[in-house]
Swiss-Prot record:
During activation, the N-terminal disordered prodomain is removed by cleavage. Concomitantly, double cleavage gives rise to a large Caspase-7 subunit p20 and a small Caspase-7 subunit p11. The two large and two small subunits then assemble to form the active CASP7 complex. Can be cleaved and activated by different caspases, depending on the context. Cleaved and activated by initiator caspases (CASP8 and/or CASP9), leading to execution phase of apoptosis. Cleavage and maturation by GZMB regulates granzyme-mediated programmed cell death. Cleavage and maturation by CASP1 regulates pyroptosis. GO terms for molecular function: aspartic-type endopeptidase activity; cysteine-type endopeptidase activity; RNA binding. The modification Phosphoserine is found at residues 30, 239. The gene is Casp7. It comes from Mus musculus. Changing residue 23 to A: Abolished cleavage and activation. This is Caspase-7. The modification Phosphothreonine is found at residue 173.
């Protein structure tokens, strides 16, 4: 199932299990058992403060005919040869993201259980479309992963090979427009134990602003976790990162700047989620998302 509205209803079907999982290749030397999600309920609800004035020179233009496309790649089932487990709970993520980005004005499509070649083909074709009337582009990758790699149903592919289709020299109609990638996947096998809380200017050479734009400019990568670490997912509620991302976007997606949004996502994941397990190696573990921005202006989804 891809493109039609019926995918939202289908994706609402979630697994009844309450065990958390991680989006990484299984560790066959040990079994993670009885991992339960413990979500703290003391989220604050203070007034919204943007903390800055919107200066047009430093804002991405959003006055286009369309917000743009959002492609969600939702990989749940994997070929046996990959050694990857079923990602129970990912349909919950995909359904929530579908509604969230649709509410922001995106044209959203969902593609399930894609092979590596299919992922490449989807994004290559998307990059070849005419985005002249669109303000931006978004892509969400939901799958197993390793550092710099993402799993298709039949194997693994470098994330950079997927995103490179949208470089400024390859996708001209998205030049100087934001290209957003949200990635829910493990980036290693380290576990975060958590901890109890108790230079001069550089002389640059000025260039003609109409001369050239770096081909890697205007990208944003929002990862569910930092390099080297596991990323947690609950089969009944979805991944910690996507739960937080959708919650903040639904609350403040049209009034906060994207970096403010993602900073709040970081805070919510860091403070409100924690694993619990009978195995002390996996008990009370934490997670912190990570953003890498090459954006050159501020981005507000309001139009």
């Amino acid at each position: 199932m891809t493109d039609d509205q019926d995918c939202a209803a289908e994706l609402e079907k979630v697994d009844s299990s309450s065990e958390d999982g991680v989006d990484a290749k299984p560790d066959r030397s040990s079994i993670i058992s009885s991992i339960l999600l413990k979500k703290k309920r003391n989220a604050s609800a203070g007034p919204v403060r943007t903390g800055r004035d919107r200066v047009p020179t430093y804002l991405y233009r959003m006055d286009f005919q369309k917000m743009g496309k959002c492609i969600i790649i939702n990989n749940k089932n994997f070929d046996k040869a990959t050694g990857m487990d079923v990602r129970n709970g990912t349909d919950k993520d995909a359904g929530a993201l579908f509604k969230c980005f649709q509410n922001l004005g995106f044209e959203v499509t969902v593609h399930n259980d894609c092979s590596c070649a299919k992922m490449q083909d989807l994004l290559r074709k998307a990059s070849e479309e005419d985005h002249s009337n669109s303000a931006c582009f978004a892509c969400v990758l939901l799958s197993h992963g390793e550092e710099d790699l993402i799993y298709g149903k039949d194997g693994v592919t470098p994330i950079k090979d997927l995103t490179a289709h949208f470089r400024g020299d390859r996708c001209k109609t998205l030049l100087e427009k934001p290209k957003l990638f949200f990635i829910q996947a493990c980036r290693g096998t380290e576990l975060d134990d958590g901890i109890q809380a108790d230079s001069g200017p550089i002389n640059d050479i000025d260039a003609n602003p109409r001369n050239k734009i770096p081909v890697e400019a205007d990208f944003l990568f929002a990862y569910s976790t930092v390099p080297g670490y596991y990323s947690w997912r609950n089969p009944g509620k979805g991944s910690w990162f996507v739960q937080a991302l959708c919650s903040i976007l639904n609350e403040h997606g049209k009034d906060l700047e994207i970096m403010q949004i993602l900073t709040r996502v970081n805070d919510r994941v860091a403070r409100h989620f924690e694993s619990q397990s009978d195995d002390p190696r996996f008990n009370e573990k934490k997670q912190i998302p990570c953003m890498v921005s090459m954006l050159t202006k501020e981005l507000y989804f309001s139009r």
